[in-house]
């Protein structure tokens, strides 16, 4: 009996974002869950300075060698006068059937890698260039959500150009007394601050500007419940059961420390028991947002539910984490899809979307041409 050819997957992780180490954790978990009888996997670590390491070098890091040491040994092998040097190891990879990006934050979620895969004419897991870019920018996301009448929080955008006009008094009048400050193009709660007075606002804004030149200042929902929904699919996506995150009362929100440093005080309710109508509303809002943004493959949709039961869509993550405490895979597990089966479906969805896009003709043929 002839052995079926394995699918050759190129997995990229790391990157030059503040979520570099988070990405490495996600990649380990995905790799461990993949069926090695079905997949041949090449690993590509993107270093903190944006260089793609070879599979051999990446596996050294994957197996526990200090990343800085491996990078120091590999860099002299690259001819940095070559404009393609940062991605040289990727272009040399042979017979990759599909790319699986596990790069959180910029490069991975902002459409950059997706554009590279498109240039390479290769299938890939997840959303396309435009959908990734629009979803990564919280301002653009909220504009699209608002256009489609999907409830989200009030906000203003602060930039270096209008910073002097965006005083705390102005924001109190236009947004509210209690504020959340967020870099527009970051994830995993990087650079996010809650502000309830002018000094907290000024300090939070100064820190947020370290991570982006466009800052969202949003209204803060009083005592919200943080609820998440996982989406899976392409043109006909499906929504998972919902999960809730309960943070310690001493913390004001589910921040980077809660997520990745010390999660000991955080509890999860999976699935969460909410009124049936609220559950359906959140699931439908998640699906509506997924479609409005043109997403493909997967997304985790985060909500804040107010004390009176109103859901506000907070963020959409197009390459959600797969760490040990990440809710995207956990919600599918409680919805009946195992970790390994979930990865299988994501890879197949990548192939399906590539085929769909391949059917589009970009060459122009005149109507009267023979």
Curated annotation (Swiss-Prot):
What highest taxon heads this organism's lineage? Answer: Bacteria
Which annotated residues bind Mg(2+) 1?
302, 315
Q: Which GO terms describe its molecular function?
A: ATP binding; D-alanine-D-alanine ligase activity; metal ion binding
Q: Name one GO cellular component term.
A: cytosol
Q: Name one GO biological process term.
A: regulation of cell shape
Q: Provide the catalytic activity annotation.
A: 2 D-alanine + ATP = D-alanyl-D-alanine + ADP + phosphate + H(+)
Q: Does the keyword Ligase apply?
A: yes
Cofactor(s) demanded: Mg(2+); Mn(2+)
Localization recorded for this chain is: Cytoplasm
Q: Which InterPro entries match?
A: ATP-grasp, ATP_grasp_subdomain_1, D-Ala_lig_Van_CS, D_ala_D_ala, Dala_Dala_lig_C, Dala_Dala_lig_N, PreATP-grasp_dom_sf
- Which residues does the record give as ATP binding sites? 172-227
Enzymatic class: ligase
Residues binding Mg(2+) 2 = 315, 317
Pathway field of the UniProt record reads:
Cell wall biogenesis; peptidoglycan biosynthesis
What keywords does the record list, in alphabetical order?
ATP-binding, Cell shape, Cell wall biogenesis/degradation, Cytoplasm, Ligase, Magnesium, Manganese, Metal-binding, Nucleotide-binding, Peptidoglycan synthesis
Q: Does the keyword Cell wall biogenesis/degradation apply?
A: yes
Name the EC number(s): 6.3.2.4
Q: Where is the ATP-grasp domain?
A: 142-348
How the cofactor is bound: the record states: Binds 2 magnesium or manganese ions per subunit.
- Its primary localisation, in coarse terms, equals cytoplasm
Any idea what job this protein has?
Cell wall formation.
Q: Which family does it belong to?
A: Belongs to the D-alanine--D-alanine ligase family.
Q: Which PANTHER family match?
A: D-ALANINE--D-ALANINE LIGASE, D-ALANINE--D-ALANINE LIGASE A
Which HAMAP family does this one have?
Dala_Dala_lig (MF_00047)
Under which name does UniProt file this protein?
Answer: D-alanine--D-alanine ligase
Species of origin reads Lactiplantibacillus plantarum (strain ATCC BAA-793 / NCIMB 8826 / WCFS1)
Q: What is the lineage of its organism?
A: Bacteria, Bacillati, Bacillota, Bacilli, Lactobacillales
